[in-house]
């Protein structure tokens, strides 16, 4: 494969350089807040901040691997890996720290903890499946691919900016929070607050965390959408095209 990094900007390296500080800020912010809340204020567990540090280390290691393995290639697959790692670090802050750490580690009765955990996992999984089906429909049932994959000099080129524009044109984005889900979540929030007050002596410190968890879930689902979209368009799809045509897909734009 021709190394187009000499003639064009190295999009993989540029994206890695932008992603590393973003990953560190998001994951270490979550780790620092976790330490203050769960290790210091509540004194319940050191695992929340350890998880944040672990996320920072794993994400940075993944970015460095992509840099070492794919620099100079402008491979869309590598670009997708970087975008997915950055998206996951954002999901960690709102989904893992904001929601799941609360229901896993904050003092609360089991009747509150387990529905929150199981419901959160189920909602994330369900939403990922909804987004996957929607994105696959856009790829398989619209002219999207013909618009964004261009052959230039025997190479397949995917323009990121054009791809985003065309995807928004053909894709019908599912509503992250349908009306019934909004009513359900914001309707049960007062119930959880009342239940915590009745059954827990730590309501004062937990109430703010509960509101953060409830308000953070829609943002977490947004990053689930972005992660699934990036994975399909920039990781799975390039590999599928490479298998079918025998050519890698390169990134431009």
Residues covered by each model-derived region:
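Charge-rich cytosolic interhelical loops and cytosolic tails of multi-pass membrane proteins
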Residues: 1, 87, 111-179
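C-terminal transmembrane-bundle signature of multipass membrane proteins
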Residues: 175-253
